[in-house]
Every structure is written in structure tokens, then in C-alpha cells.
Amino acid sequence: MPEFFTADRYNEQGELIAKGGFDLARFERALKARNINELTSGYQIDFIGKDYAKKQAGEKSATVIVPDVEHNTLAENKNSHNLFLTGDNLDVLRHLQNNYADTVDMIYIDPPYNTGSDGFVYPDHFEYSDRALQDMFGLNDTELARLKSIQGKSTHSAWLSFMYPRLFLARKLLKDTGFIFISIDDNEHANLKLMMDEIFGEGGFVTNVMWKRKKEISNDSDNVSIQGEYILVYAKTGQGTLRLEPLSKEYIQKSYKEPTEQFPEGKWRPVPLTVSKGLSGGGYTYKITTPNGTVHERLWAYPEASYQKLVADNLVYFGKDNGGIPQRVMYAHHSKGQPTTNYWDNVASNKEGKKEILDLFGDNVFDTPKPTALLKKIIKLAIDKDGVVLDFFAGSGTTAHAVMALNEEDGGQRTFILCTLDQTLSHNTIAKKAGYNTIDEISRERITRVAAKIRAKNPATNGDLGFKHYRFATPTQQTLDDLDSFDIATGHFINTSGQLAAFTESGFTDMINPFSARGLGVPGGASGEATILTTWLVADGYKMDIEVQPIDFSGYRAMYVDNTRLYLIDERWGTEQTRDLLNHIGTHQLPVQTIVIYGYSFDLESIRELEIGLKQLDQKVNLVKRY
């Protein structure tokens, strides 16, 4: 870069007036001209839509959470801690920031690879008007058109804009000791690596695993037969450690000796008991006399008492002549294991994944399922037996299958959170012909069938083989318009003419039923109250398996949570209910710190009466009004 260095400058008298050197200002101007922001942001990946993708990561979801009451109340599901969430994973991740931040042990995702044949196009809609987008990001008309060009496209920028906010939000859900594993192929691998370096930090990179997904060499390429794909692994912080794997059969065969009369417990190998003088921490110097009388004085790794314990336990090898330098005997079955490698050539292939689907369904209802052996390996590396696994590209449900199978094998209590879109299946697919309408139906059915298979094999099992199901739905525009017409000051719905408005939401006469499963156009039988309560509980930081206790106040059903919080959503609250509630609190029958009310269900007089009554109590109770 010689063009950025200047020479010393002298005046006409030969006096030095400016020392030469590196011209930082000129260098910065050159960087700016080339749109390189190295000095302030460091090395980073840029793509069309990046600023908008960052904006999306900070937005709140406009969806509500609808419990599948018919499913969740079944005996096998009502006490389950597993979750299946149907909806756009961006919306789901936004909601989960409230109640699952810093709680997930491991994330695995198998996102679309953007190969051109996997059907990926940028699906997210722009949530702002053109003018708002221009004002937000300082775009001119040409730049705005460039931004919106990614919609419905499968370009690299479209894929990165799709993935960025999801990965950004996913990181926040991980514990500080957590890991994320992402399956990907050559097409977006380089871009994904750069994006993950930016979101998780380069220091968060753990490894890039090459998984041999296909054992056969195919003739579908003129150059190279693709047999593997990548699994990128990142840690949220440096606090987590991947677990050791059991010693492989190949390693034991190569490195361990067969059992002998002297060491009959199993395959074993001798390891040195000596240490080098240069090792920090030193060692222990003493004399050891071998069985044949040979004396060795060296720097030993163990204190003399510990050495004598090894001898007593028959864990010291003195060589074939019983006079060699003593070595410790390590049995293979006593080993804590070995680190995994970044090349997995002995894990099940995609062919096994397809066979598992065929065995469960009797047909190939899913095109590209990952094998459960791959997920089991990842899960065992990343979490303990009681960890939480999140997969927000759930696909065929392999992750749930792996969690349930592992728990059955080792008695673990791992739980899963799965999310997938209710994407409609094409009419010519095998799954559609088999009676499935959406991808999420296949995933849930797989979990159900795996559970049945485990129960059939082990009727006495007490593992968690169920799951709670929730749908993430957008209220109708008419419902939103009705909500906007509510005047908090008067407690009435006002139309555009300033007159009292009749509800225009067809079939409903209140602002609860539009949020029922029927009102939102989804199955499951949820009441509007159940949807509102579930959405609020998540927003207030409660897990989705939190126990909710109905409390009766003079014929009015309230919902009590966490021994501190009361939710009043239904209509028909009046003086009698207020009196009953105040009596429960005042006589210490019911500890309450906060009462949350659905403002649309309460008239102003009832709210004022409740506010006055709460202020007269000896204890402070917060009243939160939501509209």
C-alpha cells in the first residue's frame, strides 16, 4: 500500500515542516469509497437486506399462541414437558425470548440449503410500507427496489436475510454453556460460516464437522461425487464443553491389549507412570522396587501412597520380565472416553434416515430426513441427560425421535422444543396421498408413532413420550380493526363516525371469541380465553408447561399462576366478584402480587371499583390493564 505513505516535506529553506508517514485520512477515504467499514465494524459479511434482517430480529411478534386443547388434554400429553410449536419460526423465536432466554442447552437445525431444488425462496413479508422502509434505513428509490428484490427469490442475499434474524434470536435462547449445530452443504456453507462468526463471534466457533451422509459413489456429477455435508458447531460462550465419546471399537482394537491371566478384567493398555522434569507442577521422586528386584528411581506422576494403592489394586504393569519401569494399567471399560473428531464417517447415512421413515409410516412420506443416529450422537456430545434441545426447522421430527429414543436407552429426562411451519404439501406428494395436508402433521404423527413403538417394546416405561402442541396464528384484520376502535377513556367501541360501534367480526359479540381456535381458523378447540391467557403467560416469562389453577369468584373463573399472579380475562365481572376477590386476598386465603385484566371485558365502573378496593388492602397488589 505505498500510495498511503507520504514523504517528509521541507520548506524552501530546507527546514522540515511535515514528517512523512502513513496517511490515515487518505486510507479511510479509500475504504469508504470501496464501502469497506473495517475500522469500525471489522471484517463482516454484507448482503442485500442485512439491515432489514437486523431490524426483524428486534421486532415483537404480532401473532397469538393458540393451545391445541384437544391434543394437550389427552392423558399422554397433559403432563408432558415436550413442546411442538406450529408456526413461522421467526414468530416463534420472538415469543420464546420472553420465557426461554438463556435456558436451552442445545440447538440443532437443518435449514433449507438453498440448492435451487429444495424449494427455498425468501418467505418473510415486509412489515412496513415503502416510505417507512426508506425512512428507517435511509434508502433512495433504487436502493428500496434492491432491498425488495429478495422477496420470493432464492439468491444468496435472500437466504442470508432469512437466516440472520432467526440465528440472532436463537443465540439468546442458549445457556452460556450451550451449543448450536447447523447442517449445511457447499452452496451456503461459506456464507453461513461468516454470518455465524458475526452473530456468535469468531471465538464461538468450535468445529466444522464433515459428515459422510452417503456411502455410495454416484455418477450424478461430471467432476466429484458428493458424499458428505457439513455440520457447523458454535458455542454461545467459552463456558461449555462437549462431552467425551465412548472409545470406538476400532480404537480399542488398535490401542488395547487382550485380557491376560494377570489382567483379566478386559482389554487394557499400559500408560507411563513417569513425568518429564520440564512439566509444570513437578512430580514425585522415590524408589520403586519391581517384583524381580530391579530398582527404579525417577520422577513419578503419583505420590508414593497413590502408587502403592495402584499396586494393591493390581493396576501396575512391570513388563514381561517383571523388572521394567512400572506403568499404570488402564482398562478400556474404565476410560472416560475420547474427544469427538471433525470427520464422521461411521454415523448412519441418509439412507438409514429414509428407512426409519419407511418403517414408521410404511411409505416415504418425507424426502430428506436425517437419521436418528446422527442426532443422538450430537445430543450426547452437547448435553446432559436432563438437557433441553431446540430444533426450529423440525422437518420430519428426527430430533424429537432421537430425544425420546435416548431417554429410553439411558433413563434420561431430556426434553425437546420443536418448531415447524404448517406448510401445505403438494398434491402429487406421497405424504399428501397418504392423507397428510401439512408438514407439521407428519412431524407430530412421527412423534406419536415413535412413542407407541417405545411403549409396545417396554410397557413399564415411565418416560415422557407426549408433547404439548401450540399454534402461532395471526388475528384477522377485522379483529385488529375492532380492537383499534376501542376507546379506553370511555370503555366503548367507537366507529369512524364517533358513534358506538357494533362488532363487525362475523359471529362474535365480544373481543374474546375472535381469539378462539374457531375465530382464528385453526383446529384444536381452544377458547378465546385460553389463547389470550397462553399468549400473556409467555409474554410474562412463564414456561409453556406452567401449571394454571382456576379460581372461582362468585361464579367468575379467574386463572391463578405461580402463587402470585391472577388473570381476569372473561366478561361478567362486577361488584360481587370484586368483593369476593378482596375477601380472599384480605383474609390471606390467596396470596396475590399482581392482577392482570383484559380491558375489553371490563366496564370502567368495574375497573374503578377494583382499583379502589385494592388500594384499601394492607398489602400492595398491582393491577395491570391490557388492551
Task: Kindly give the residue locations of the regions a language model identified.
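Accessory, often C-terminal, charged low-complexity segments
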Residues: 1-63, 72-76, 81-82, 90, ...
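Cofactor-binding loops of NAD(P)H-dependent oxidoreductases
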Residues: 87
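Conserved beta-strand/loop positions that form the S-adenosyl-L-methionine
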Residues: 109-111, 392
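Charged, low-hydrophobicity low-complexity segments
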Residues: 125-134
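Conserved SAM-binding loop and adjacent beta-strand
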Residues: 360-373
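Conserved class I S-adenosyl-L-methionine
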Residues: 386-395
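Phosphate-binding glycine-rich loops of NTP-binding sites
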Residues: 396, 401, 416
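Conserved SAM-binding loop of SAM-dependent methyltransferases across substrates and taxa
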Residues: 400-410
